[in-house]
């Protein structure tokens, strides 16, 4: 029985899930808007929002924790230099999930995941399929 077990499996092993959400978080921080399936978008929120909260206080220890979770120097740099300052006065709720219809091939529900208060403009990046 799976009583009180949180999170979605998404038909993947735990290592595959961890790598996928790590990559999706890095893409989100880099582009600030990505398109993915709705269940992945909802799970991505559980990965990305704590990283932004971590970036609100800039310290070597926090940078190392963020690097451990993203494995991307560029993402850590943007988190602490840009996003942490942008959301310094916001107590959570850094992501917005917008439903955007269904994928043509398998009719999967799709969604945009974007950072709130982002500068408007730019292209949409397709996330992990």
Curated annotation (Swiss-Prot):
<dbReference type="InterPro" id="IPR047859">
    <property type="entry name" value="Ribosomal_bL17_CS"/>
</dbReference>
<dbReference type="GO" id="GO:0022625">
    <property type="term" value="C:cytosolic large ribosomal subunit"/>
</dbReference>
<dbReference type="GO" id="GO:0006412">
    <property type="term" value="P:translation"/>
</dbReference>
<keyword id="KW-0689">Ribosomal protein</keyword>
<dbReference type="InterPro" id="IPR036373">
    <property type="entry name" value="Ribosomal_bL17_sf"/>
</dbReference>
<dbReference type="GO" id="GO:0003735">
    <property type="term" value="F:structural constituent of ribosome"/>
</dbReference>
<protein>
    <recommendedName>
        <fullName>Large ribosomal subunit protein bL17</fullName>
    </recommendedName>
</protein>
<dbReference type="Pfam" id="PF01196">
    <property type="entry name" value="Ribosomal_L17"/>
</dbReference>
<dbReference type="InterPro" id="IPR000456">
    <property type="entry name" value="Ribosomal_bL17"/>
</dbReference>
<comment type="similarity">
    <text>Belongs to the bacterial ribosomal protein bL17 family.</text>
</comment>
<comment type="subunit">
    <text>Part of the 50S ribosomal subunit. Contacts protein L32.</text>
</comment>
<keyword id="KW-0687">Ribonucleoprotein</keyword>
């Amino acid at each position: 029985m799976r009583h009180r077990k949180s999170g979605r499996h998404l038909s993947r092993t735990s290592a595959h899930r961890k790598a996928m959400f790590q990559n999706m978080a890095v893409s989100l921080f880099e582009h600030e808007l990505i398109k993915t399936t709705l269940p992945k978008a909802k799970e991505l929120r559980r990965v990305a929002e704590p990283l932004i909260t971590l970036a609100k206080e800039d310290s070597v220890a926090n940078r190392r924790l963020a690097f451990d979770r993203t494995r991307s120097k560029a993402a850590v740099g943007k988190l602490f230099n840009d996003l942490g300052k942008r959301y310094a006065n916001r107590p959570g709720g850094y992501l917005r999930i917008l439903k955007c219809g269904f994928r043509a091939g398998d009719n999967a529900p799709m969604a945009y995941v974007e950072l709130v208060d982002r500068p408007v403009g730019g292209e949409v990046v397709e996330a992990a399929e």
